[in-house]
């Protein structure tokens, strides 16, 4: 895929001004030059052109906010003066795997006042005697060369990233986490409300069961009392009948005695 088409795909319906990172690794550059990249990418902070067959960076547009440029595994042998002119705020530059042979080719980088990290792995220039001392002397603004400072201390991982880009990504991640936490909190609160409603329903059912039990018990007692009253009435009637029978018996006996007289 050629570089122009790759840039078009990477835009993803965005305007160039909305792009902050652009990765064009392994695409093809015609005549070894940058093409399709314009000054409209005014907010671009990270540009990667690894293994695209570049010979020259002369077509590089002015990118005032670019901080990190990846140019490793190309065929660049010079012409670095364009970098200082077009990328005034560049802090990280990777030229590893290019055809840079002597310290003189690096001299234009002196004008990159913000440059603090430079990588030249697998370039012939690294084979020169006193290579590191010479580069640090040539570029006093430099903090790290090939991942190490003047005292051979390794650069922290944070220095390998673009300042600002990562901070914004961290902010976005933080906002997403806060949003997720808020959503989780709302879900938990909703669950608690549901649990409370369920508890109230259970308590209501228990109260209803209790009332029903009391009514049922009361109902049984009432029926039992009515049965007892019926039995008492029957007994009273039997006693009255017996007394009536006894009275009639006495009357008959009295009548019989009168007849005998």
Curated annotation (Swiss-Prot):
The modification N6-acetyllysine is found at residue 86. InterPro entries: AN32, Leu-rich_rpt, LRR_dom_sf, U2A'_phosphoprotein32A_C. GO terms for cellular component: nucleus. The modification Phosphothreonine is found at residue 254. Keywords: Acetylation, Chaperone, Leucine-rich repeat, Nucleus, Phosphoprotein, Repeat. Some glutamate residues are glycylated by TTLL8. This modification occurs exclusively on glutamate residues and results in a glycine chain on the gamma-carboxyl group. The keyword Transport does not apply. LRR repeats lie at residues 16-40, 43-64, 65-87, 89-110. GO terms for molecular function: histone binding. It is found in: Nucleus. PROSITE patterns: LRR. The keyword Chaperone applies. Gene3D superfamilies: Ribonuclease Inhibitor. Residues 123-161 form the LRRCT domain. GO terms for biological process: regulation of apoptotic process. The modification Phosphoserine is found at residue 158. Residues 244-254 have a biased composition (Basic and acidic residues). Residues 149-261 are annotated as: Disordered. Residues 157-243 have a biased composition (Acidic residues). Transmembrane segments: none annotated. Monomer. Interacts with histones H3 and H4. Belongs to the ANP32 family. Histone binding is mediated by the concave surface of the LRR region. Multifunctional protein working as a cell cycle progression factor as well as a cell survival factor. Required for the progression from the G1 to the S phase. Anti-apoptotic protein which functions as a caspase-3 inhibitor. Has no phosphatase 2A (PP2A) inhibitor activity. Exhibits histone chaperone properties, stimulating core histones to assemble into a nucleosome. This is Acidic leucine-rich nuclear phosphoprotein 32 family member B.
